[in-house]
C-alpha cells in the first residue's frame, strides 16, 4: 500500500471581479480572479511512506473562497481513467495505422468534492493550471486558467455567467415516435426488488470505453493531436463522474484519431452515421481492439439541432453498443453531458417525461432538450436503467479489472483493491466499513474480509451458505465455499429444459417466452397478440419480417413466423402492435431460444427442433 502525499493549495482570492472575458470555454460575463499557491503537508502522524516519483500528486486539496466563504476542494486522481491496455491510434499520410501504448497512468485528471458537503462533486484537470468544475451548495462553478502573463491567475465563475454560443436548444436524435409508452415508467416506481436483484444492482459495473475522433474534428483543432487527446481525457473524466451515480466506472481503453481520412461516411444524417459507425465497430474495430462501448466524436453539423444519437438498450451488443456525438461546444461540460445522455440510451434509459423532475433547478441528463450542462440522472432514469439491467443482464459490464492488471501505484482510498491492499473502503471521511482500516487499507484485527456476498460481520460465511438465489426456473442457486468472500461463478440449468409451466425452454439461464418479452418491451398489462398477427411476418415489409439483409426486409417462412417480429396487445385490444427503432432492426424481434412450438425453439430467426441446437 502506498500512502498518497496530501497537498493543500491556498487560493488567494482578490476582490477583483471581471465584467467580461473570453476564456477557453467561451465568453464569461462575470468572474473572480484567484491565484493558487501550493503548500505541501505531510500525512497524519508526520511520516511519509516512500512512493514512486510521479509528476502529479495522488491527492490534493484546494482552499479558496466562494461568495466570501472559505471552502476546501478535496481531489483524488481518477485512478481508473485508463485501462491497463490503453492504446492510441492515428494514421500516417500513406494511410498506415500507427498504434502506440503511451504511459498514461501518471495523469492529471481528478475527481473530488467540497469538504463537509454531502451533495458535492468535482471533475478537475491539473495538467496546465486548474480546469474543470465543482458543485457547491447546489450551484455549479467553473475554474480555468487565465491566459495572462501571470500564469498563476485563474478565473472562477458560475455556469449562468457563460454566454451561450447558440441559444437554440440541442436535442437527441432518438425521436418521440420511437419511445415506449409512459406506462412502464409509472409502474416502475412500484417495483419491489428481491434481495438477489438488489445485490446485483449494487455490484460495481465497468464499461471499457473506446473513442474515435473524426477527420473534421482533427482539422478543427488544427491537427494538434495533444490538444485533441487532452480534450477527450477531460470529457471522459467528466463522463466518469456522471455515470458513477449509476454505479458504473468508465475506463478509457482506446482512442483513435482519423488523421488521414474518415473510416466511415460521416454525414449530416445522424441515423446513417450511427449505422455506419456501428458496422465499422463490428467489422473493423472489435477484431483488433476489444471494448464494451464506443463513441464517435465529430465536428460535422448534424441535421436540425441534433447533437447525438445512440441505440436504446444495446450495451454489450456487437453492432449497436455505439453512439455518435457532435463536438458542438467549446465547453467540455456540455459535450460530456451529451456523451452521458447517449450512453444512457445504450444503458436502456429513454428520455425523461415531464413528471421526471428530480434534478433540482438543472435539467436532468436524459432531458429531451439541452441548453445547459447536466450532471444527474432523474429517479425515472435510474428506475428504467435498473429494469433494463435486470431484464437483459448485459454480461460485459461485470468484467472487473484484475488486481494485477492495474499497473499504476496503489492508492489507498480510491475504492479499488490493488496490489498490497486487503480492502479499500474509500477515504477515512467516507469509509463506512467495520472491517477495513481506511488509513492503511488493511483488514482490522481478526477480520477475514470486508465485502462480498460471502462476507458477513468481517468473516467468511460458512460452507453452504446461500449467496445467490436462483433467479428463475432456469437458474441454480450458488453457495459459499467457506474460503472466500466472493460468491462462486453463476451457473444455470442446461439449455432445453421446460420452464414456466412449459411455456418455454431454458436458454443460457433464462426462460424466454413471448409473454415476458411483451411485458419487458411495453410494460405490465400486455399480452401476446393473436396468432394471425404473426402472419404479417410473411409480408417482408412494415414491421413484418424475419431479418434484414442489405437494407431489405426478408419475410419469414410460414413455419418461422413466431421467430420474426414480436406482436403484443394491450389489455383486450385487437390491434397488432409491434415496436420499431429505425436504427436498430433487431429491436422488438423474438429472442433466440423462445418456444415456437412443442419441442421447437427460435434460432437464427428460424423455428427448429430442440435437439438441433441444444
From Swiss-Prot:
EC number(s) per entry: 3.4.24.-
Tissue-level expression: Expressed by the venom gland.
Glycan attachment residues as annotated in the record: 187
Keyword presence, Glycoprotein: yes
Sequence motif D/ECD-tripeptide, residues: 473-475
The protein's enzyme class: hydrolase
Keyword Protease assigned: yes
Pfam families xrefs: ADAM_CR, Disintegrin, Pep_M12B_propep, Reprolysin
Source superkingdom: Eukaryota
Cofactor field: Zn(2+)
Keywords: Cell adhesion impairing toxin, Disulfide bond, Fibrinogenolytic toxin, Glycoprotein, Hemostasis impairing toxin, Hydrolase, Metal-binding, Metalloprotease, Platelet aggregation inhibiting toxin, Protease, Secreted, Signal, Toxin, Zinc, Zymogen
A GO biological process held by the record: proteolysis
Subcellular location: Secreted
The Peptidase M12B domain, residue ranges: 205-401
Disulfide bonds: 316-396, 356-380, 359-364, 412-441, 423-436, 425-431, 435-458, 449-455, 454-480, 467-487, 474-506, 499-511, 518-568, 533-576, 546-556, 563-602, 596-607
GO cellular component terms, semicolon-separated: extracellular region; host extracellular space; plasma membrane
GO molecular function, one term: metal ion binding
Residue positions of the active site: 342
Signal peptide: 1-20
Positions of the propeptide removed during maturation: 21-188
Residues binding Zn(2+): 341, 345, 351
Start and end residues of each Disintegrin domain: 409-495
Family the entry assigns: Belongs to the venom metalloproteinase (M12B) family. P-III subfamily. P-IIIa sub-subfamily.
Role: Snake venom zinc metalloproteinase that inhibits platelet aggregation and degrades fibrinogen.
Assembly mode: Monomer.
Protein name: Zinc metalloproteinase-disintegrin-like BmMP
Organism in which the protein naturally occurs: Bungarus multicinctus
